[in-house]
Amino acid sequence: MKPSTNRMLTRIKSVYMFIQEKGLVTTQELVDEFGITPRTIQRDLNVLAYNDLVHSPSRGKWETTRKKVKITS
């Protein structure tokens, strides 16, 4: 796996775990927490949403779904 792909997957996993820990979060909170651009956060959230791991109950807010996930390192 390419280093850039590995870095992206690690970041997406971190974003998911942050949302799971905090409950409902805003896109801006994620930008502030991870120090990356809003567009990058949006891409990461789209990957998570596509896999039914997060959803947006209202514009700019995100929470995890009830789907069970096994997190590995």
UniProtKB/Swiss-Prot annotation:
Residues within the DNA-binding region(s): 25-44
Secretion signal, residue range per the UniProt entry: none
InterPro entries attached to this UniProt entry: DeoR_HTH (IPR001034), WH-like_DNA-bd_sf (IPR036388), WH_DNA-bd_sf (IPR036390)
Superkingdom of the source species: Bacteria
Keyword Transcription regulation included in the entry's annotation: yes
A GO molecular-function descriptor: DNA binding
Induction: By disulfide stress.
The name this protein goes by in its record: Uncharacterized HTH-type transcriptional regulator YtzE
Species name: Bacillus subtilis (strain 168)
Lineage of producing organism: Bacteria, Bacillati, Bacillota, Bacilli, Bacillales
Gene name tied to this protein: ytzE
